[in-house]
Curated annotation (Swiss-Prot):
Biased composition (Basic and acidic residues): 1-12
Residues covered by region (Disordered): 1-23
PTM (free text): Lys-52 undergoes hypusination, a unique post-translational modification that consists in the addition of a butylamino group from spermidine to lysine side chain, leading to the formation of the unusual amino acid hypusine. eIF-5As are the only known proteins to undergo this modification, which is essential for their function.
Organism: Nicotiana plumbaginifolia
Further remarks about this protein from its record: There are at least two genes for eIF-5A in tobacco: 5A1 may regulate the light-dependent translation of specific transcripts while 5A2 may be a housekeeping protein.
SMART domains (alphabetical): eIF-5a
Coiled coil: none
Keyword Protein biosynthesis assigned: yes
Pfam families the UniProt entry points to: eIF-5a (PF01287), IF5A-like_N (PF21485)
Alphabetic keyword roster: Hypusine, Initiation factor, Protein biosynthesis
PTM annotation (Hypusine): residues: 52
Protein name listed in UniProt: Eukaryotic translation initiation factor 5A-2
Function field: Translation factor that promotes translation elongation and termination, particularly upon ribosome stalling at specific amino acid sequence contexts. Binds between the exit (E) and peptidyl (P) site of the ribosome and promotes rescue of stalled ribosome: specifically required for efficient translation of polyproline-containing peptides as well as other motifs that stall the ribosome. Acts as a ribosome quality control (RQC) cofactor by joining the RQC complex to facilitate peptidyl transfer during CAT tailing step.
PANTHER family assigned to the protein according to its UniProt record, in alphabetical order: TRANSLATION INITIATION FACTOR 5A FAMILY MEMBER (PTHR11673)
Amino acid sequence: MSDEEHQFESKADAGASKTYPQQAGTIRKNGHIVIKGRPCKVVEVSTSKTGKHGHAKCHFVAIDIFTGKKLEDIVPSSHNCDVPHVNRTDYQLIDISEDGFVSLLTENGNTKDDLRLPTDDNLLTQIKDGFAEGKDLVVSVMSAMGEEQICALKDIGPK
């Protein structure tokens, strides 16, 4: 045994899976699903009856939670689909750099500096204008499958 104290930075997720399996027939509208390797929010589900050859099928129409692109997939209802672990975390906005990155304050007092401003023009304008006016802003960051993006903004009053 050594008397040294080891400090570990918790950057990784300990090898935890980015997705979990769920039977296609149990995935509902407003749920999440992985289509073509992208985490998506389901906007429409339709099920076809069992045919002469095989299973009932689920037709998913979903929107990529990061790019907003519409994706579709057809899966037998008895088969498993990958469902992404989707997390939303709120951070206080501290600073916006010239190169488009934001500096965020985490709950434990550390800063998170590896996120870009969102690509959504409306949200981008709200963040820049609110920050320029000196408001205290809290941004919601959505993370799934190793990607993170600012998805919402809350104004918690003047500084």
